[in-house]
Amino acid sequence: MGLPWYRVHTVVLNDPGRLLAVHIMHTALVSGWAGSMALYELAVFDPSDPVLDPMWRQGMFVIPFMTRLGITDSWGGWSISGGTVTNPGIWSYEGVAGTHIVFSGLCFLAAIWHWVYWDLEIFSDERTGKPSLDLPKIFGIHLFLAGVACFGFGAFHVTGLYGPGIWVSDPYGLTGKVQAVNPAWGAEGFDPFVPGGIASHHIAAGTLGILAGLFHLSVRPPQRLYKGLRMGNIETVLSSSIAAVFFAAFVVAGTMWYGSATTPIELFGPTRYQWDQGYFQQEIYRRVSNGLAENLSLSEAWSKIPEKLAFYDYIGNNPAKGGLFRAGSMDNGDGIAVGWLGHPVFRDKEGRELFVRRMPTFFETFPVVLVDEEGIVRADVPFRRAESKYSVEQVGVTVEFYGGELNGVSYSDPATVKKYARRSQLGEIFELDRATLKSDGVFRSSPRGWFTFGHATFALLFFFGHIWHGARTLFRDVFAGIDPDLDAQVEFGTFQKVGDPTTRKQAV
């Protein structure tokens, strides 16, 4: 036939049986990829340290999605929370991966069957004997079934009525676990960070889908609307389906990048805005202040800070610190986190506490500046030593650690003080193992960044696809060169412009 690559799908345009076959094969490919990818990730995933080496640091992409839907255990005997399990059953990571691969195989066979037996009675119009599909009716069926699935997910799976619930955590990503969620029917259900909104919205949207599906099954579209929206043309279905997909892709790109109850930071890593706003830093200082108010020493107060919370407050976990073409997991960048060294407190020789100004997200290098509690610059690491006034040596800066591995250790030699001041620009200080994975020291993005980039990019491409196919179906007659007045009788000489009734000649 010699079709160009971008027109090869025309072979299934008027062939409902084989159109169905290629869609089943596509489902087989998607499901097969999901199952295979899950098995690959499970083969390389190290569950031994859920605090300092969680799934998102290791670049896991499908494991977080399984986990947020309630899968936490492995046939390998480990649990995502760090415990051990004995009999996880079919609803384990490997079990779900296996069911996807089995389903993929069944879809593969079904696709072959439908490709061979393409000329089914159900696809032919009984009046004309030609292949045809009742698209409005099919739309109603699909809407109804999607509504049932949506309602079932919200009413049973999420609520724990018949299912595990979903991953729920606190605002700082410390206490996450799979649990049942009650629907939130008040205004709080519209807060994207309230898990109850997931249940209530699925129940509401599912109910609407069921009712809309029944409506479209029982009511035929008006003739003008049917013709105006080209409801008899399969390319209309393609165009509107692409619209639904690109809209969903834009939405999930937003919920992933800005954060929401559907994208917990324990599974996908923190968002860049949590670094920009000092979100975890504020919580750490609040906890330390509370500890001091309870008459704890500074060392005791800092020692009570969970290592998990301190680790979030580190720029290497900011998904916007990755770069274009920097492939690999976060662990391949700055290394595998081994332990928290503790919180460094800097003081000048007058005893003032100094704070290192943190590096903004989009900087690769940043001057080392130490300010007091009023924001006045008191010390720095100068670019030109000859002109320096605030150098660590001149100001006599010392550093003492509270909490972590270096708890109670202090340094006064300028080289060591400057080393820890530089590292403080990047948030809390961690010991990182760069040898094991031959990590190159260049920051990588988390799966949060990859997911957002991928979905935003494809959403844009699919938006153009929607415009393209929508225009093709709406203006099909124009593109085909069919003029509604093509067979009109034209009297030569009557009009100045042939066939244009607005230019009638006046009789002299």
From Swiss-Prot:
Pfam families: PSII. Binds multiple chlorophylls. PSII binds additional chlorophylls, carotenoids and specific lipids. The chain crosses the membrane at residues 21-36, 101-115, 140-156, 203-218, 237-252, 457-472. Keywords: Chlorophyll, Chloroplast, Chromophore, Membrane, Photosynthesis, Photosystem II, Plastid, Thylakoid, Transmembrane, Transmembrane helix. The keyword Transmembrane helix applies. It is found in: Plastid, Chloroplast thylakoid membrane. One of its GO terms (cellular component) is chloroplast thylakoid membrane. It comes from Secale cereale. It is a multi-pass membrane protein. The keyword Lyase does not apply. PANTHER family: PHOTOSYSTEM II CP43 REACTION CENTER PROTEIN. This is Photosystem II CP47 reaction center protein. PSII is composed of 1 copy each of membrane proteins PsbA, PsbB, PsbC, PsbD, PsbE, PsbF, PsbH, PsbI, PsbJ, PsbK, PsbL, PsbM, PsbT, PsbX, PsbY, PsbZ, Psb30/Ycf12, at least 3 peripheral proteins of the oxygen-evolving complex and a large number of cofactors. It forms dimeric complexes. One of the components of the core complex of photosystem II (PSII). It binds chlorophyll and helps catalyze the primary light-induced photochemical processes of PSII. PSII is a light-driven water:plastoquinone oxidoreductase, using light energy to abstract electrons from H(2)O, generating O(2) and a proton gradient subsequently used for ATP formation. One of its GO terms (molecular function) is chlorophyll binding. GO terms for biological process: photosynthetic electron transport in photosystem II.
